[in-house]
Design a protein with these regions (language model features):
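Single conserved hydrophobic/aromatic residue that forms the stacking wall/gate
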Residues: 1-6, 11-12
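Feature captures the RNA virus RNA-dependent RNA polymerase
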Residues: 19-34, 38, 191-192, 199-200, ...
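Active-site-flanking structural segment that lines cofactor/substrate pockets
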Residues: 34-71
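Short acidic/polar active-site loop segments enriched in Thr and Asp
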Residues: 76, 218, 253
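Short glycine-rich phosphate-binding loop at a beta-alpha junction
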Residues: 79, 219-224
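Divalent-metal-activated hydrolytic enzyme cores
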Residues: 162, 168-171, 199, 203, ...
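Glycine-rich phosphate-binding loops at beta-strand->alpha-helix junctions
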Residues: 225-233
Length: 277
């Protein structure tokens, strides 16, 4: 991680460089991560017997993943990503979902590498389109070594756990999409109506499920994808998740929507609980 880091991020950088186990895990994840471009991946599904448990919780993403991973399950966590900047605003102290994942794990060091800049981030920058596309990056065996809380706390090494992370960007519906966390996202709001947005999300969320299924995930940790900084309407997003997951209820053991919220900001959780709970 670069020079713009505040104290906690500097500690993460130093820890990942100095601890052999973390260095080795970063290298292994980099060697085995897969970029699924927009039209890649056929609909491969291994059917299981019972229907998946579908859960809506108020947890943070890694907080939700921890008990499954600790029990030996193959867990895939969706990263609500910046399409144009590795880790979003993590190096500047921002605190959305992607930044939280990067602060607690080795993920940033899998995203911020030359081949991913060339194949994932720079092509999105050249699009200059805040709707982005369906590209997904699947990173196996990311090591979570901090507790996923507002101020992440280092876990004892025996409690570190691996998760797979699926990186994908929701459409950026901000009035002014371009900022330091999302460079080259365009300076005008996306021209899209609710029907078009629904179709776009159906394609993108469908791709997320396909990739996770193709990679053999047993537990899928999702959430209010794009409903925070990217301003997607939670009712539309939750409805699309409900539609798409119907085809995957016998593919995963558990699908958990981890919709973290504060006491003041409960809309996303309330909507997801109403639609999917």
């Amino acid at each position: 991680i670069g020079s713009g880091l505040v104290g906690s991020e500097m500690c993460i950088r130093d820890r990942c460089r100095k601890i052999e186990r973390l260095r080795d895990c970063i290298k292994e994840s980099n060697n085995n991560q897969t970029l699924y471009l927009e039209k890649d991946v056929s609909d491969i599904k291994t059917q299981r017997g019972d229907a998946a448990d579908v859960i809506v919780s108020g947890k943070r993403s890694f907080e939700a993943a921890a008990p499954y991973a600790s029990a030996g399950k193959k867990v895939c966590v969706l990263n609500f990503a910046s399409a144009t900047n590795p880790g979003g605003g993590v190096v500047n102290g921002s605190s959305a979902q992607e930044e939280a994942l990067c602060r607690c794990s080795t993920l940033y060091f899998n995203l911020n590498i030359p081949c991913m800049m060339d194949k994932f981030y720079n092509p999105h920058r050249k699009m200059n389109n805040p709707l982005y596309n369906d590209d997904c990056l699947y990173t196996p065996k990311v090591i979570v070594f901090k507790k996923d809380v507002l101020f992440p706390e280092l876990l004892p090494e025996k409690e570190w756990y691996p998760v797979d992370v699926l990186t994908c960007a929701a459409p950026n519906l901000r009035r002014y999409p371009n900022n330091f966390m999302n460079p080259n996202a365009g300076d005008k709001p996306a021209a899209i109506d609710e029907h078009q947005l629904t179709e776009l999300l159906r394609s993108r969320i469908g791709k997320i499920f396909k990739v996770a299924a193709n990679e053999g995930a047993e537990v899928l940790i999702l959430g209010a994808f794009g409903c925070g900084a990217f301003c997607n309407p939670p009712q539309v997003v939750a409805n699309v998740f409900k539609q798409v997951q119907q085809d995957y209820l016998h593919v995963f053991d558990t699908i958990e929507y981890a919709v973290f919220h504060t006491e003041r900001e409960t809309e996303n959780y309330r909507v997801f609980k109403s639609v999917l709970g």
